[in-house]
Every structure is written in structure tokens, then in C-alpha cells.
């Protein structure tokens, strides 16, 4: 009976250790993804501002012709 208790304790302990390692890796991956999201937002803002300027310039040219 003591052998079964020790075996069960060992299995549970190893399971918890592997679970905590997986959680740490998941957190690191999420942190990396957050950095990528910030870069994507920065690029999107640049594209959006360029589009606004292009539309404003085109509208100005159309207004001059009318």
C-alpha cells in the first residue's frame, strides 16, 4: 500500500511540474504575440494615415476642377 501511495505521489508531482512548465511557455508565447500585435497596430496606423492623406489630396484635386 505504501508503494502505491509513493507511486501516486510521484505521478501527481511530475504532472504538476510538467503543467507548470507548459504554463510558463504559454505565457512567454503570449508575451511574444503581444509584441507582434503592437507592431501590426503601428504598421496599420501608418497605412491608415497615408490613406487619409491620399484621399484628402484627391478630394482637393477634384474640388479644384469643379
Swiss-Prot record:
GO biological-process terms attached to the record: defense response to bacterium
Expression tissues: Expressed by the skin glands.
Signal peptide (from-to): 1-22
Propeptide span(s): 23-39
Subcellular localization: Secreted
Entry keyword Mitochondrion: no
Keywords carried by this UniProt record: Amidation, Amphibian defense peptide, Antibiotic, Antimicrobial, Cleavage on pair of basic residues, Secreted, Signal
Valine amide modifications at: 66
Gene Ontology, cellular component aspect: extracellular region
Chief location of this protein within or outside the cell: secreted
The protein's role, per its UniProt record: Has antibacterial activity against Gram-negative bacterium E.coli ATCC 25922 (MIC=300 uM) but not against S.pneumoniae ATCC 700603, S.choleraesuis ATCC 14028 or Gram-positive bacterium S.aureus ATCC 29313. Shows very little hemolytic activity and no cytotoxicity.
Protein family (similarity comment): Belongs to the frog skin active peptide (FSAP) family. Ocellatin subfamily.
Name of the protein in question: Ocellatin-PT5
Biological source species: Leptodactylus pustulatus
Highest classification ranks of the organism: Eukaryota, Metazoa, Chordata, Craniata, Vertebrata
Amino acid at each position: 500500500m505504501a508503494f502505491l501511495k509513493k507511486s501516486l505521489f510521484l505521478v501527481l508531482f511530475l504532472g504538476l511540474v510538467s503543467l507548470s512548465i507548459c504554463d510558463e511557455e504559454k505565457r512567454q508565447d503570449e508575451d511574444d504575440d503581444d509584441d507582434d500585435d503592437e507592431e501590426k497596430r503601428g504598421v496599420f496606423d501608418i497605412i491608415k494615415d497615408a490613406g487619409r492623406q491620399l484621399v484628402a489630396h484627391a478630394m482637393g484635386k477634384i474640388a479644384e476642377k469643379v
